[in-house]
């Protein structure tokens, strides 16, 4: 018997031992795991969510009693919506009530309807049982799954007992999903998501809910667990832009301390939303996420940065991961209704500014981008009094943006009558930032953001009496700057415009104003030569994400 056969037989025996422990039930793990004693009574120390506390719970406060009465009164409204789902499934009333909170006894049926689990069960009769049995026989990650199951929601009464009923169901779901979707297989945090479904859904329904959550375009959660990681890349870029726009001091401090390069705030947020905050707030946030879709991820991230702005600016470089996680935990240590009100306001604000993450669009011809976006929605007036021409055909890129230098804008010989600055076309995903505004010392966007249509959009065809604006060489910097020297613009404008108008329209940034911008440190860092990998490669290294992503 060779080494391969010996290793195979050892893995098979190990797999059988783990499966046998779960089949025996919670008594199989008592001597080894020193878990809770069987037949223990939890009558007086279990709260309304099912969390087991060490001491006996005090009587209900007036606020808690009011919350229970309010939840009971809302139950009839949710029952009416479920009875007439075709009318309410796309209504504003559903979203409003989701932010106010779903009643606990309605959450299971509502999650099932939102994720369309009944239809999946009808289309795939008996498939879950087949996938579960195959996973028991051939799972390659059963040890990791067993280890993660042992630490999932252990304070909840359903998962309190080691090798108990709910832990066995959770193991079966993860084994079945590993066989159902080999591309994802098993990744970290899937156990926490499946456990949340098991709190309110039967075993097979929870499995199909997990399948729908990871497969639907509305939620786009598979990108966090797939090997490609496209969702993580895009949301990380989107998050950097939104935080840089709303809290420039916070983002500038993080860039100066290199916190964003050492850990993924969005990945940290996703992990903490699962098991780092109270279960009640976690369920409320998941209610909103299932109703709103992936657009709710950015508002949640924005709130975390906004609340912790002062603390984040004081975060030192020592131990960034632990400090950053602790800041997020403190962010959500507040009233649930208050958090949801802030989340709703942030959602409206980002939607109004087109800062939420839109759903993916159809791939464009000639582009190999991982997630293309629709064409630009139009241009913006660059200076006061300038005219704007109708938009032309959108520009196309032959290769991914963040893996190569940006394309040069083609030269145009078409004059611009009247001396007006015209903005005809944009590269896909570059709407929102007029180029001359960057010369005033404002924040400048990265080409890494061009894949996303809510990123800043840089014009490529500014026709100023013939010549086009040139960009700085990307071999030195990955930030695009508009040339603002009068001697370069004067030959284009001297026929019809005096030099004073040129200076007032496109003034060069002064040294004093440029030093105050939070992005200067980033520009100097990216322009300076380094011995490590180039920061202008416009792709995120795997070390920037937490393990398992």
From Swiss-Prot:
It is a lipid-anchor. One of its GO terms (molecular function) is GTPase activator activity. InterPro entries: Rab-GAP-TBC_dom (IPR000195), Rab-GAP_TBC_sf (IPR035969), Rab_GAP_TBC_domain (IPR050302). Keywords: Cell membrane, GTPase activation, Lipoprotein, Membrane, Palmitate, Ubl conjugation. One of its GO terms (cellular component) is plasma membrane. The keyword Acyltransferase does not apply. Pfam families: RabGAP-TBC. Ubiquitinated by a CUL7-based E3 ligase, which leads to proteasomal degradation. Acts as a GTPase activating protein for RAB5. Does not act on RAB4 or RAB11. This is TBC1 domain family member 3D. The gene is TBC1D3D.
